[in-house]
Amino acid sequence: MAAVAVLRNDSLQAFLQDRTPSASPDLGKHSPLALLAATCSRIGQPGAAAAPDFLQVPYDPALGSPSRLFHPWTADMPAHSPGALPPPHPSLGLTPQKTHLQPSFGAAHELPLTPPADPSYPYEFSPVKMLPSSMAALPASCAPAYVPYAAQAALPPGYSNLLPPPPPPPPPPTCRQLSPAPAPDDLPWWSIPQSGAGPGSSGVPGTSLSSACAGPPHAPRFPASAAAAAAAAAALQRGLVLGPSDFAQYQSQIAALLQTKAPLAATARRCRRCRCPNCQAAGGAPEAEPGKKKQHVCHVPGCGKVYGKTSHLKAHLRWHTGERPFVCNWLFCGKSFTRSDELQRHLRTHTGEKRFACPECGKRFMRSDHLAKHVKTHQNKKLKVAEAGVKRENPRDL
């Protein structure tokens, strides 16, 4: 009811001020309407006694009636009025409403002035003044305050919890000491052997780099240049951007580190030992007979087939075990094969590809063995023609 009374009082005051002598020169100076308007204007003053039927509250422009958006008054309006406005625009005769603080606001309720409205909305329609629906969920004690985006505005002590807490600083990068390397007999086949490595050193380069940057009490296992190169590599892995001076400082160390990795990468490629009887009998040493080509024998009893490559022997062993890991993914097919070339040959039956062409007649075939049979037909024809020619020459010679 108090809000309705304030709205009615505001509308009545606007209606009466439109008919004051300053706005209507035809009315007399001491007319009853002028006296009533002066009495109503003193209601909001600090020293005046408020009417018992109305609740004295600070003036809020957002509660004004739509008629308060336009004020076609003259410039001689008294400035002591609480609703005093600046002179109207000379061309339009319309004056936008200004934001001001009421005397009834206490020191604890003083808020920073709201920013000026957007030029495209001059009549108090800025998004700062018109609160969105999400502000209704805030408690009544939280008054809206304007905080600019570019500046760090100071908030009252009671509103500091509205801002999000600052992010914690990132932890400093630390290098952890890795576990010691296993014994040389337990090293996997992909490990990298290093000359002069102690029992506590690992064959993997990353382990040595991590141990080098671990710091005391462990002594570094690389010289000072390699340790600096490791620090530069760690900085690059963390995503840091090196400046011109930093890049010039670490450039030589990075180049030295890359040069030391080149011979290690050459020895990193090693094959798993073949478990065929021939390789097991020879002790797995390929340099025992360098002039002889190494052969891999099938260890299944009663087979004894020999292959020149370990991949061929593995494919043959899959034939013994019945394993078919290569499956056709064509729709409604699902056939499986022991070897990958068998699967590729089967896929040509689905696609219709004929990649083998006859050099004599140009006829194409899906399989190479079919082409070989077709080429033999051409060779047989040539032999028959040659034999027929020889038989014809023999009667003439007689």
From Swiss-Prot:
Query: Which family does this protein fall into?
Result: Belongs to the Sp1 C2H2-type zinc-finger protein family.
The record's principal subcellular location, in a coarse class, is nucleus
Please give the biological process terms from Gene Ontology that the record holds.
bone morphogenesis; negative regulation of transcription by RNA polymerase II; post-anal tail morphogenesis
Q: What does this protein do?
A: Binds to GC boxes promoters elements. Probable transcriptional activator that has a role in the coordination of changes in transcription required to generate pattern in the developing embryo.
UniProt short sequence motif 9aaTAD, positions renumbered to this chain: 187-195
Q: Which residue stretches does the UniProt record annotate as biased composition, category Pro residues?
A: 163-174
- Matching Gene3D superfamilies, A to Z? Classic Zinc Finger (3.30.160.60)
Transcription regulation as a keyword of this entry, yes or no, is: yes
**Any idea where this protein resides?**
Nucleus
Q: Name one GO cellular component term.
A: nucleus
Task: Note down the stretches annotated as region Disordered.
Answer: 160-215
Record has Zinc-finger as a keyword: yes
Source superkingdom:
Eukaryota
Q: Give residue ranges of zinc fingers (C2H2-type).
A: 296-320, 326-350, 356-378
Keywords for this entry?
Activator, DNA-binding, Metal-binding, Nucleus, Repeat, Transcription, Transcription regulation, Zinc, Zinc-finger
Q: What is known of its domains?
A: The 9aaTAD motif is a transactivation domain present in a large number of yeast and animal transcription factors.
Short name of one Pfam family: zf-C2H2
Please give one Gene Ontology molecular function term for this protein: DNA-binding transcription repressor activity, RNA polymerase II-specific
Top-level taxonomy: Eukaryota, Metazoa, Chordata, Craniata, Vertebrata
PANTHER family named in the record: KRUEPPEL-LIKE TRANSCRIPTION FACTOR, TRANSCRIPTION FACTOR SP5
What's this protein's name? Answer: Transcription factor Sp5
